[in-house]
């Protein structure tokens, strides 16, 4: 089984789906001849041509609007938002149009589209190239919100998203594009949208994470294992719809829960996980649910020392696990 990094898995998923279904096309800034700023679409322009790999103006509202219109006419657009920080001009199109079209038409119209959005900090991008805006969209019924944490899941989830009859926002942890590697089958497969994945079984503390933070959570779990702390790591993978069953099963086993994400603490996705636990497994808890998240400041600093202060890392996760384990 070949090994590849996360961005290679994303590219392979799009390539395979474009070869499988001629309705699939890509639209976004620099996705054509340049192959994308992260090289996620490299080679696809030469293979499929300018009518299926379309360079757009710097206008996210138009990128998503074109995708919605094409989807309504039976196409399967994959819209790339160059950085998730740039998704806000398209917010109305996503929330008011794409997410609500099936509901308002009583199921007559569907919007089978994917919006790919590299997210997260840690690459020296500063305020406007480091944001994690996933919580805005998990508050929007009608959307599915997916965050892969491994090359295997990146390929399988993206293929599932492209085949889905409804709009999917596909957040990709850009710091992990080339850092996270793993085996990926060459044959056609999908990873179903919805179920979380227990990637490390344990009995003392449950850690819930996604994207780059899941990668770090596994490292932190190995670090504290040497101290006798047995950590269960749950990769949430799909943020909306929420896999509440897997979350509750894990907490009922360990009695302690840590939720990790790099987005700001207040109003972040971790609050939804914490509420799920409070409502469904309160009597199973041996300690308060702990959230380890980015601080409530307007953006990720450009200064590298300040960026390191902002970002969650394996050492910070390990420290939070130790604190919970002492209860």
Regions found by a protein language model. Name each.
Residues 1-167, 171, 174-327:
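Thiamine diphosphate
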């Amino acid at each position: 089984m070949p090994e590849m990094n996360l961005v290679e898995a994303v590219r392979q998923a799009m390539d395979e789906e474009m070869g499988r279904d001629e309705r699939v096309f890509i639209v976004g800034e620099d996705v054509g001849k340049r192959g994308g700023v992260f090289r996620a679409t490299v080679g696809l322009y030469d293979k499929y041509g300018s009518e299926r790999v379309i360079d757009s103006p710097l206008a996210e509202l138009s990128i998503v609007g074109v995708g919605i219109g094409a989807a309504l006419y039976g196409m399967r657009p994959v819209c790339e938002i160059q950085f998730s920080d740039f998704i806000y001009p398209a917010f109305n199109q996503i929330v008011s149009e794409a997410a609500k079209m099936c509901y308002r038409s009583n199921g007559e119209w569907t919007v089978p589209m994917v919006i790919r959005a590299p997210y997260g900090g840690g690459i020296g991008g500063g305020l406007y190239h480091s944001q994690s805006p996933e919580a805005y969209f998990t508050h929007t019924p009608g959307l599915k919100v997916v965050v892969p944490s491994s090359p295997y899941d990146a390929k399988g989830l993206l293929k599932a998203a492209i085949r889905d009859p409804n709009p999917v926002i596909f957040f990709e942890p850009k710091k992990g594009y080339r850092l996270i590697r793993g085996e990926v089958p060459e044959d056609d497969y999908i990873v179903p949208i919805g179920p979380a994945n227990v990637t490390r079984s344990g009995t003392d503390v449950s850690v819930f994470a996604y994207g780059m933070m899941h990668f770090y959570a596994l490292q932190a779990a190995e670090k504290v294992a040497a101290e006798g702390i047995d950590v269960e790591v749950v990769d949430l993978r799909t943020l909306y719809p929420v896999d509440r069953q897997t979350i509750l099963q894990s907490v009922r086993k360990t009695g302690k829960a840590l939720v990790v994400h790099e987005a700001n603490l207040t109003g972040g996705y971790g609050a939804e996980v914490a509420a799920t636990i409070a409502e469904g497994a309160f009597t199973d808890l041996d300690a308060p649910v702990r959230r380890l998240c980015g601080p409530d400041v307007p953006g990720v600093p450009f200064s590298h020392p300040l960026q390191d202060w902002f970002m969650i890392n394996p050492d910070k996760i390990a420290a939070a696990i130790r604190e919970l384990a002492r209860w």
